Amino acid sequence: MWLELILASVLGFVIYWFVSRDKEETLPLEDGWWGPGSKPSAKEDESIRPFKVETSDEEIKDLHQRIDRFRASPPLEGSRFHYGFNSSYLKKVVSFWRNEFDWRKQVEILNQYPHFKTKIEGLDIHFIHVKPPQLPSGRTPKPLLMVHGWPGSFYEFYKIIPLLTDPKTHGLSDEHVFEVICPSIPGYGFSEASSKKGLNSVATARIFYKLMSRLGFQKFYIQGGDWGSLICTNIAQMVPNHVKGLHLNMSFISRNIYSLTPLLGQRFGRFLGYTEKDLELLYPFKEKVFYNIMRESGYLHIQATKPDTVGCALNDSPVGLAAYILEKFSTWTKSEYRELEDGGLERKFSLEDLLTNIMIYWTTGTIVSSQRFYKENLGQGVMVHRHEGMKVFVPTGYSAFPSEILHAPEKWVKVKYPKLISYSYMERGGHFAAFEEPKLLAQDIRKFVSLAELQ
């Protein structure tokens, strides 16, 4: 017992030294050109153009012809979702897609919010911009940039947007009313893909900051999960004076000695300040962290090394694309869903919503360019980029959803984000928080903003 206390004290001192030695710094606000060829000498067109999602008979006919040629491989007996997407259940998804899914209707739903495009650093950047339909007298909306990840899209935010822009209508307090901007990451959906290597999270952060500046916002809130959390973190590192607050539902934590402490075992976790909830979500460590990450990260290695190879198959087969993406909406929502024949997909999502997200990738042909984002960010390894070792000095809030792929205790998060003012253990939910639990996430964003406004 005494030896454990001494070791914990020594480790605590090492952590304190490691945490306190970093200085406040910012990422440089540089410039870039990601369009084809050399950057033209003429000034870039900064106009903001309305945009509508469209489809055609030819597009739908081609989709149906490809679906009709789907060739299934029978699953192993009792394999459920342990080998990936179960092809027996995939047949049900394909039948629904071919015979019941109405893409024209979903296009109308996509167009319920105003879409726009604007040129930034040589790329046509797509975004939706939703203003409040009503405001309390004398109040102005709070601008909020929300950034998606992979394999999601701007569509992930469609159910949370009205809770933020029109809270009173949906039974929520109108103390905070938001004006929401949801861009598509370059190379995702309707945002143009880069013609050049190197467009990573930092470049995307700069592009999105320029977007907010072009829209006239000098100070704003930002929110993200998955890649969106890293992009938003980079924005806060780049222009902290323009960010009123940063809210995350996932964190990229590297160069953080605290993230190694669970290896010391559950008893040391208590000495180091982990809560009972942290211990529940981290242990047994081998199963809940090590094995789970090993099971769920195969795609990451492929996409961080040779994304174009697997992309060729996915860009040619809509059913292959659906299986590849929808498998993530199963096990990333709850790892236990791999025990189910249908992967638990319809427990939290409708097939219409899931296939709408797939169609955004399919109709734009952006699965390859979206996968390249892994190569640009991880292709050189981890802990090689400047931003990975930098702290974030803006007010930060964090929603810890219990079924996230890797739980990040408050102790970990606070090392990277010293101004963490709100950390919430969420009641339920996994990786796709806005898509799965929009009300819970909206409530936590509002709670965080209430605290951030007091800073």
UniProtKB/Swiss-Prot annotation:
Keywords: Acetylation, Aromatic hydrocarbons catabolism, Detoxification, Endoplasmic reticulum, Hydrolase, Lipid metabolism, Membrane, Methylation, Microsome, Transmembrane, Transmembrane helix
Compartment(s) of residence: Microsome membrane; Endoplasmic reticulum membrane
Transmembrane residue ranges: 1-21
GO MF, one example: enzyme binding
Active site: 226, 374, 431
InterPro entries the record matches: AB_hydrolase_fold, Epox_hydrolase-like, Epoxide_hydro_N, Epoxide_hydrolase
GO biological process: arachidonate metabolic process; cellular response to glucocorticoid stimulus; diol biosynthetic process; epoxide metabolic process; hydrocarbon catabolic process; liver development; response to toxic substance
CC per GO annotation: endoplasmic reticulum membrane
Top class in the EC scheme: hydrolase
In-chain residues carrying the UniProt-annotated modification Dimethylated arginine: 295
Topology of the protein relative to the lipid bilayer: Single-pass type III membrane protein
Membrane topology, Cytoplasmic segments: 22-455
Short name of one Pfam family: EHN
Documented EC number(s): 3.3.2.9
Record text on activity regulation: Inhibited by 10-hydroxystearamide and methoxy-arachidonyl fluorophosphate.
Modified residue annotations for N6-acetyllysine: 439
Catalytic activity reported: cis-stilbene oxide + H2O = (1R,2R)-hydrobenzoin; 1-(4-methoxyphenyl)-N-methyl-N-[(3-methyloxetan-3-yl)methyl]methanamine + H2O = 2-{[(4-methoxybenzyl)(methyl)amino]methyl}-2-methylpropane-1,3-diol; 8,9-epoxy-(5Z,11Z,14Z)-eicosatrienoate + H2O = 8,9-dihydroxy-(5Z,11Z,14Z)-eicosatrienoate; 11,12-epoxy-(5Z,8Z,14Z)-eicosatrienoate + H2O = 11,12-dihydroxy-(5Z,8Z,14Z)-eicosatrienoate
Superkingdom of the source species: Eukaryota
Protein family (similarity comment): Belongs to the peptidase S33 family.
Function recorded in the entry: Biotransformation enzyme that catalyzes the hydrolysis of arene and aliphatic epoxides to less reactive and more water soluble dihydrodiols by the trans addition of water. May play a role in the metabolism of endogenous lipids such as epoxide-containing fatty acids. Metabolizes the abundant endocannabinoid 2-arachidonoylglycerol (2-AG) to free arachidonic acid (AA) and glycerol. Binds 20(S)-hydroxycholesterol (20(S)-OHC).
UniProt name for this protein: Epoxide hydrolase 1
